[in-house]
């Protein structure tokens, strides 16, 4: 593989990496992660459980509770140890939350918790992410054909130009979609249902992958455009050099042709033969000498 093919293959690598990052971010549900403050359930159905409030009632005839039960009620009324922290993570499609035992997760659609007036913006964000993936995939296909095909020509330079345009569009669309999703999530945190609102949250690894894909898109776009510009200038210089060589060859042939014409033309007459006495062949009264060559 020559140097040009190696450079094209190296340019294809970050495109595939950006495509992988975008696909992983879209299908995953770790854009935002955090904890929710959830009220502990009573231990009536879970005797001996660790994540519930323990109490027992006195079965005496007067119906009053013993000292242990009163202590438990005192803790319940003050709110100490009343809540438990549950981890959750949210993506474009669903929101998942840990169960009480911490072994499995309970998921629901993220669209179901977004306020109704903001769901259109959520769909715009999802559409931007999908279009971002389509543009990156198109760029990967174009670069793959650029690497696999060996036919030279200026038309292949247009592939680099298209890749640069598609990748910068993908990066800009991805940036807008990421910012729209961030806005939607923050609005949902403030205006969403009470049984979903997180206490603490931060951005997850899916969000980092999405922005990593954005950075790769811009880097590939700049690299492809610089390659196109350099190749275009080189192609133009070669054309100018070829036109200059043809012009110099044409200018070199013109003096040779003129010289050959002079060599094959009539030789000048000697000075002593320039004038001849033709008086015998002229009518009376005409001059006696004429100049001929």
Curated annotation (Swiss-Prot):
Residues 1-8, 142-160, 226-293 are cytoplasmic. It is found in: Membrane. Glycans are attached at residues 59, 67. GO terms for cellular component: plasma membrane. Pfam families: GSG-1 (PF07803). The chain crosses the membrane at residues 9-29, 121-141, 161-181, 205-225. Keywords: Glycoprotein, Membrane, Transmembrane, Transmembrane helix. InterPro entries: GSG-1, PMP-22/EMP/MP20-like. It is a multi-pass membrane protein. Residues 30-120, 182-204 are extracellular. Belongs to the GSG1 family. PANTHER family: EPITHELIAL MEMBRANE PROTEIN-RELATED, GERM CELL-SPECIFIC GENE 1-LIKE PROTEIN 2. This is Germ cell-specific gene 1-like protein 2. It comes from Homo sapiens. The lineage of its organism: Eukaryota, Metazoa, Chordata, Craniata, Vertebrata.
